[in-house]
Amino acid sequence: MKCKFCSREAYIKIHYPKMYLCEEHFKEYFERKVSRTIERYKLLTKDERILVAVSGGKDSAVTAYVLKKLGYNIECLHINLGISGYSEKSEEYAKKQCKLIGAPLHIVRIKEILGYGIGEVKTRRPPCSYCGLTKRYIMNKFAYDNGFDAIATGHNLDDEASFLLNNILHWNTEYLAKGGPILPQQGKFIKKVKPLYEVTEREVVAYALAVGLEYIVEECPYARGATTLDMKGVLNELEEKRPGTKFNFVRGYLKKKKLFEPEIKEKEIKECKICRMPSSGDICAFCKFWGLKKEINFKVSSTDEEPFGP
């Protein structure tokens, strides 16, 4: 098949809207789609300092690459989770990605600052639970300590549709009231944005291959059997039969999101006695779980690795 816009061979078939695109026109299409998402939801401005959380995977790498290409002021943060055999590979991919992108890279290794890696802590909590807590805290604290205006993550349309379906099935109305492509800044909680909110996982993979971004393909050993994978499977079946299902599902939710806002429960926000970050109690969940006695200061004067790129 030929590209819709030129005589070159098609690189990819876009299912919604249905069209064939060559590699060059696909890259233009993808970048334009991300740019429009940023503009539509007022995610970012060119004068903001943006911290992109890069895991070594495809989504975060593509997020950093596109934001850099669109002219945004980005730096990257990689959190090494201390998972033997997996985290070492992830860090190496993050380094390669930032070298190609030309973005400064900061690295936080939790085993060095907390004493244990994910999966090494003696606790009844599943690894995914305290891993998520740890990553969210470090991303926000690092961004706050270093004066960033926003944190950008690599959540794509498939991720958002699966989260949405799971939260509807469990009637998690607080998530439904707060979900979406942007979480505005609130005090010491830095603004979080999702530039890939309306692009599919398939499109992200195709773009990464087109621009030469290598990424880790192995899944985290603790992610197997995760509910998200089940939700994605259901949505993929629906998408196969009715192209546009994921997009319309997520867009429809955003139109009706205000219906859930009365469900938001106002919580008293305190300041953690240890790290001075926002907390619902005297000690925040992060400091409590890791047994911290003093604040971790993530302020840096230069990147942990030399800034990559030109």
Swiss-Prot record:
Zn(2+) 2 binds at residues 272, 275, 284, 287. It catalyses: 5-methyluridine(54) in tRNA + hydrogen sulfide + ATP = 5-methyl-2-thiouridine(54) in tRNA + AMP + diphosphate. One of its GO terms (cellular component) is cytosolic tRNA wobble base thiouridylase complex. It comes from the Archaea. One of its GO terms (biological process) is tRNA wobble position uridine thiolation. Changing residue 59 to A: Loss of binding to ATP. Disulfide bonds join 128-220. Zn(2+) 1 binds at residues 3, 6, 22, 25. Its EC number is 2.8.1.-. GO terms for molecular function: 4 iron, 4 sulfur cluster binding; ATP binding; metal ion binding; transferase activity; tRNA binding. Its cofactor is [4Fe-4S] cluster; Mg(2+). [4Fe-4S] cluster binds at residues 128, 131, 220. Keywords: 4Fe-4S, ATP-binding, Disulfide bond, Iron, Iron-sulfur, Magnesium, Metal-binding, Nucleotide-binding, RNA-binding, Transferase, tRNA processing, tRNA-binding, Zinc. ATP binds at residues 53, 79, 135, 154. In TtuA from T.thermophilus, the sulfur inserted into the nucleoside comes from the C-terminal thiocarboxylate of TtuB, but there is no TtuB ortholog in P.horikoshii. Free sulfide has been shown to be present at relatively high concentrations within thermophilic archaea, and may be the sulfur source in vivo. The thiolation reaction likely consists of two steps: a first activation step by ATP to form an adenylated intermediate of the target base of tRNA, and a second nucleophilic substitution step of the sulfur (S) atom supplied by the hydrosulfide attached to the Fe-S cluster. Belongs to the TtcA family. TtuA subfamily. Catalyzes the ATP-dependent 2-thiolation of 5-methyluridine residue at position 54 in the T loop of tRNAs, leading to 5-methyl-2-thiouridine (m(5)s(2)U or s(2)T). This modification allows thermal stabilization of tRNAs in thermophilic microorganisms, and is required for cell growth at high temperatures. Can use free sulfide as sulfur source in vitro, which may be also the sulfur source in vivo. This is tRNA-5-methyluridine(54) 2-sulfurtransferase. The gene is ttuA.
